[in-house]
């Protein structure tokens, strides 16, 4: 277990890049694995979660070759060429990898067993397993197949399904659409609110027959997926920590280049702008079918805001660091409709309220969100990440504007999504204001 010590720097300025998008990296590996021919991926996120996805597709018989940093060749097995793995597949901390892989495995005529770390074994998998079972797959595991370790045995063909998802979840949607590749008819998923659409964009690029009508997505089976070139853009969820730091730290100005700004993922930018942050967007070319931009922000006086409704799925992963921004804003911020945060890597609602509270923030926990009274002066303290990478980095950002020294415990988890986070912040500060401790 490691910890990080944070002290407020005198400045935060500069231009940096962030690692490849985690969601797109997972999909590039999985879609390439079931495509015919070669998929060449550049900008792949070489962090623990996505590296575990590569291990999983290798375990299923797919040849994956590393050509250089973030550069991989995936020689796909096609829809009918995956092989039964010899051992249990361990996905570490990645809920995305497990749920998406379950969709692929639902169409394979063999048993595959999946597990993960302590945190992942607590997360709900029944939201994917239940509809896959209705399609004809067999899913067994703890708590009636709703918790890892899980065993999945697929069927061919799977039954077509029209599924009304109770949650806006790109992971659920993607799992069912992937299973639909082996179905006997169209598979339709309708969500209460539209979730991120990386799957729709990327599967279409690989050759799948998809149609989108508002909150409903339909996949019609029968098309062969073909290997593609995938240039993964920078991860907006990683950029979020730097953008918030650049907004709340005194005298700061930060530019993050090459960031994916898909509208279904860019809710944090809209929320920060609503709070008064001057977020500049310089748009460039598309990458992996996704809009890309250089993002710039600088110190600003923020004001509280109401954040809820359809914007929540567009910024669900960024709520921890958005809460840090709200602590520094003038007035009250209410975050609602975010109960999904309770079943992430940690109960993020409880963790945000409890850990930022240790720094002096005035936060009230609600069943589906948070109420934050801004303007409190943050003071350094010892805080716990709970093994949650986004909590760990959000607490580090809070430490950048707190008086004194902040120590964030259990920070190895940062490696699951942003291994270079500490080095990037120190580069912007021009000093070692963030220091890893044994």
Which residues does each PLM region occupy?
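Structural preference for solvent-exposed beta-strand-turn elements
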Residues: 1-438
């Amino acid at each position: 277990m490691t910890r990080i010590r944070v002290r407020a720097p005198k400045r935060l300025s500069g231009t940096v890049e962030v690692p490849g998008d985690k969601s797109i990296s997972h999909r590039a590996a999985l879609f390439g694995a079931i495509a015919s021919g070669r998929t060449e991926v550049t900008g792949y996120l070489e962090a623990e979660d996505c590296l575990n996805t590569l291990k999983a597709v290798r375990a299923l018989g797919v040849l994956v070759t590393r050509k250089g940093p973030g550069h991989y060749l995936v020689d796909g097995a096609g829809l009918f060429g995956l092989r039964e793995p010899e051992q249990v597949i361990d996905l570490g901390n990645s809920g995305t990898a497990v749920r998406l892989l379950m969709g692929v495995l639902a169409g394979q005529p063999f048993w595959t067993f999946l597990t993960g770390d302590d945190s992942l074994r607590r997360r709900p998998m029944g939201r994917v397993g239940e509809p896959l079972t209705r399609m004809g797959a067999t899913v067994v595991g703890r708590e009636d197949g709703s918790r890892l370790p899980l065993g999945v045995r697929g069927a061919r063909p799977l039954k077509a399904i029209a599924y009304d998802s109770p949650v806006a979840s790109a992971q659920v949607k993607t799992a069912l659409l992937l299973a639909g590749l082996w179905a006997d008819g169209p598979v339709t998923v309708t969500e209460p609110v539209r979730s991120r659409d990386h799957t729709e964009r990327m599967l279409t690029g690989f050759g799948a027959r998809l149609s989108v009508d508002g909150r409903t997505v339909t996949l019609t089976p029968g098309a062969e997926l073909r290997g593609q070139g995938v240039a993964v853009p920078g991860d907006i969820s990683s950029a979020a920590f730097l953008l918030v730091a650049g907004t709340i730290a005194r005298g700061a100005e930060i530019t993050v280049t090459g960031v994916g700004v898909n509208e279904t993922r860019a809710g944090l930018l809209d929320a920060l702008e609503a709070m008064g942050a001057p977020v500049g967007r310089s748009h460039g070319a598309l990458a992996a079918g996704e809009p890309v931009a250089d993002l710039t922000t600088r110190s600003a006086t923020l004001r509280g805001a109401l954040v809820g409704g359809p914007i929540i799925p567009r910024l669900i992963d960024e709520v921890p660091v958005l809460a840090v921004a709200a602590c520094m804003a003038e007035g009250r911020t209410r975050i609602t409709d975010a109960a999904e945060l309770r079943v992430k890597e940690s109960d993020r609602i409880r963790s945000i309220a409890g850990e930022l509270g240790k720094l002096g923030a005035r936060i009230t926990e609600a069943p589906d969100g948070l109420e934050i009274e801004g303007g409190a002066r943050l003071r350094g303290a010892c805080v716990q990440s709970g093994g949650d990478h986004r909590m760990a980095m959000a607490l580090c950002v809070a430490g950048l504007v707190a008086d004194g020294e902040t120590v964030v415990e259990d920070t190895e988890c940062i490696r699951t999504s942003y291994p270079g986070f500490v080095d990037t912040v120190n580069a912007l500060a021009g000093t070692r204001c963030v220091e890893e401790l044994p």
